[in-house]
Amino acid sequence: MDSELIKGTLSLIILSLLSRRAMYGYEIVTTVKEETDGVLEWKAGSLYPSLHKLEKDGMIRGQWEGDPDSRRRKFYQLTEAGRTALAEKEESWSQLCAAICQIMEKSE
């Protein structure tokens, strides 16, 4: 899969997953891999910078959870600004997909 193409969809996918429920980083990575039958397989190196940017931009909020004596995880959840951004990104994505499909159909 073209990594440049995937980069443009990271925030859309992250926001979409977090609209379901709060998740921690590794859980996002495994969910993406499972739900795409391995087509999308992210490394932490690409996920965490996106999570940090979304958090800085106020789209998501992170909260550490777990026993201080054991493994703690940072769970991310969507904010209201994130819900608004997700709706806008979904609309843009739908328009883009439709436009690309039109071009591809005419090329056949």
Task: Name each model-derived stretch.
Residues 71-90:
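Basic, amphipathic "hinge/linker" alpha-helix immediately C-terminal to the N-terminal HTH DNA-binding motif
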Residues 47-54:
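Basic amphipathic alpha-helical segments that dock to polyanions
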Residues 84-108:
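Amphipathic alpha-helical dimerization/coiled-coil segments
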Residues 2-46:
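N-terminal helix-turn-helix DNA-binding core of bacterial DNA-binding proteins
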Residues 1-3, 64-65:
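Short beta-strand/turn micro-motifs at beta-sheet edges
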Residues 55-72, 77:
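Beta-hairpin "wing" of winged helix-turn-helix
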